Amino acid sequence: GNFKGKHRVLGVTPEKIGKIAIKKGIPTIIDYFNKRISSKIIKKYGKAKIITATNVFAHIDDINNIVKSIKQTLKEDGVFISESHYLLPLIQTVQYDTIYHEHLRYYSLESLNFLLKKHKLEIFDVKEISTHGGSIRVYASRKGKYKISQRVKKQFKKEKKHLNKKSFEKFKKNVISSKINLFNLIKKIKDKNKNIFGVGAPSRASTLINYLGLDQDIIDCVLEINGSYKIGNYIPGTKIPILDERILSNKMPDFLILFSWHIKDELKKNLKKKGFKGKFIIPLPYPRIET
């Protein structure tokens, strides 16, 4: 919606969020993007100057046909901008909690380059961003259309240094020690008869809870913001209930474990505003207690 009013925009998504976009006045096709939809778009709207795909690639099975359709929909001098959860911060900050069935793959600049090159698209700029605990934004076009930024070369160099067999072996060790340290931290708290609520029920919470073997005797419940469709359900694989965070007004735990730890500063600020006076457990990149 940021471009609306300045440019002609069009969204494509198979999800319910598309209906919200339509209500907000953003033209949206509620369907999966593919060759058929691409042809439909070209016929009705013409080709696009800019195409964006935000956190999309990791969820798509037939990725090559998608890239083919993206290229088909792009103008000759068009730019394709994609954002993907980035492999480099994932292993550096021990984000094992984000490895789950919904994510089919994790991207580096090297792998994105390999994919786009196959379809004669060239990466001419790159940027690391903070989304999802660390993502990579790449700008691509048909070969030779734009000058290649020095940032691309620098990023390849950085990956060569930090993404290798050694780094993955280190990641494996860090995952195991992180699990043990977090479990011991929680055990010490429970040994003192303190109670713990969780905050946020993203998929990563389910991965972490099940990997550690936590249950409702350890985590009383997980809180979600009022209106979340997850309220009234349970964390998969457990009997830990997901409740409305408004229960904090009459039931205050000693500790809150922040499952969306990558936005901990924002969460802590909001929870303190709502009157929480206890302590926070930050599970990753290294387990610790914060006030």
List PLM regions with ranges.
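Conserved beta-strand signature within the Rossmann-like core of class I S-adenosyl-L-methionine
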Residues: 74-85, 279-285
